[in-house]
């Protein structure tokens, strides 16, 4: 499947329709804290229990998700997207019919899903029947500091500037 334009609401609806539990992190999460900027993907941290991973796998099927080969890897070298491999943890960079989805089960700066869940904020988005959970402000800052990329550091500065305004 060729790369599709990002349609985040359709992507997130596809996950929530099958009752997948997850928390949005990354660039799309910035909007939950008053800062909107462009992003090429949606990053989520799924709740790691097997039943949720089964729902996630079913949702990924409806989204026509397939692993995205990056760098020196080609498609034949990637793990198959199945429950056994999802349960191994790790991160999945996926191409879907609604754009790119990064399923992050290991994230620098994050101790556990439970920690992230404890600080998460719920937001209602237009067109969605369910509120979505987004990383809380302090967790988002910590995740971006741990990533340390120039874009993340710019995001931190902008979030802090807006918080002080």
PLM regions with names:
Residues 1-165:
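Compositionally biased terminal segments of proteins
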């Amino acid at each position: 499947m060729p790369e599709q334009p990002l349609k985040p609401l359709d992507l997130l609806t596809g996950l929530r329709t099958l009752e997948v539990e997850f928390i949005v992190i990354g660039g799309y999460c910035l909007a939950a804290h008053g800062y909107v900027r462009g992003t090429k993907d949606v990053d989520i941290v799924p709740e790691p229990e097997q039943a949720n991973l089964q729902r996630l796998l079913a949702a990924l099927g409806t989204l026509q998700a397939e692993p995205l080969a990056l760098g020196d890897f080609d498609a034949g070298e990637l793990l198959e997207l199945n429950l056994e491999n999802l349960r191994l943890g790790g991160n999945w960079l996926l191409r879907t019919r609604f754009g790119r989805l990064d399923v992050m089960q290991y994230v620098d700066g994050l101790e556990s899903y439970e920690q992230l869940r404890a600080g998460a904020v719920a937001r209602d988005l237009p067109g969605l029947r369910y509120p979505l959970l987004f990383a809380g402000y302090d967790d988002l800052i910590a995740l971006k500091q741990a990533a340390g990329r120039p874009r993340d550091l710019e995001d931190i500065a902008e979030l802090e500037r807006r918080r002080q305004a």
